[in-house]
């Protein structure tokens, strides 16, 4: 479990304590899978919509493009989990107008310097397609905002970069922070290390919603 997921659990606990209704429940979908929305809002036993958890520096979405050196252009990958919206075309058109800068962006990345309203439009469309209605974040206090007001609360930037796949292991220097943060939510958690990995064992009580 890494820091981003711990933040999701803290937000889940806040929602569960703040909004106590008999017919409404919150479910953490778990993991750091960016294709899965963070928290499901379940009303009368059915998923009504989703809430996305974002800290101050979180990524809000991504899509993959493939370069074509012959035509000097980028194309939207068919393997994307997201669906194209009008802002997708605007972003790709901008990249095509400066093809070689983005083609050679490398892992460091190259900034996409267009009006942030384009990025906000893409993010809002991206989340609406996934039935995400609200964002929850935290600075000094928890803030819950409608997805349509995303740009009023966040400064948005974007870049193009070559991205490696796979998850990284937590650094040993962060183990104490990780274990203490988990214990704030799960008092009975037990930890052990094996092959430079940190594992957590958590006991939970099962229950049924009617």
Tell what function each PLM region has.
Residues 1-74:
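Catalytic centers of nucleases
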Residues 28, 41-43, 137-138, 164, ...:
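Surface-exposed beta-strand edges and flanking loops
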Residues 208-209:
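Conserved small/polar residues in nucleotide/adenosyl-binding loops
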Residues 2, 28-29, 104-107, 162-164:
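Intrinsically disordered, low-complexity segments enriched in small/polar residues
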Residues 35, 171, 191-192:
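Intrinsic disorder/low-complexity signature
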Residues 154-155, 161-167, 171, 176:
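Conserved beta-strand/short-helix segments
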Residues 49-144, 148-151, 175-192, 199-200, ...:
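Catalytic cores of nucleic-acid endonucleases
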């Amino acid at each position: 479990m890494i820091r981003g997921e711990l933040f999701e659990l803290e937000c889940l606990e806040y929602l569960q304590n703040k909004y106590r209704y008999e017919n409404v429940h919150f479910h953490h979908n778990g993991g750091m899978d960016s294709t899965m929305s963070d928290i499901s809002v379940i009303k009368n036993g059915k998923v009504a919509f989703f809430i996305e958890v974002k800290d101050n520096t979180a990524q809000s979405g991504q899509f993959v493009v493939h370069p074509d050196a012959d035509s000097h252009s980028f194309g939207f990958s068919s393997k994307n989990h997201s669906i194209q919206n009008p802002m997708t075309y605007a972003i790709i058109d901008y990249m095509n107008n400066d093809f070689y800068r983005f083609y050679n962006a490398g892992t460091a990345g190259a900034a996409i310097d267009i009006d942030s309203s384009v990025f906000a439009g893409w993010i809002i469309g991206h989340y609406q397609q996934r039935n995400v209605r609200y964002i929850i974040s935290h600075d000094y206090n928890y803030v819950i905002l409608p997805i349509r007001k995303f740009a009023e609360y966040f400064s948005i930037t974007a870049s193009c970069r070559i991205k490696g796949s796979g998850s990284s292991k937590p650094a040993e220097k962060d183990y104490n922070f990780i274990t203490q943060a988990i214990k704030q939510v799960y008092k009975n958690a037990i930890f052990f290390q094996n092959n430079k990995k940190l594992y957590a064992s958590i006991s939970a009580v099962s229950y049924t919603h009617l």
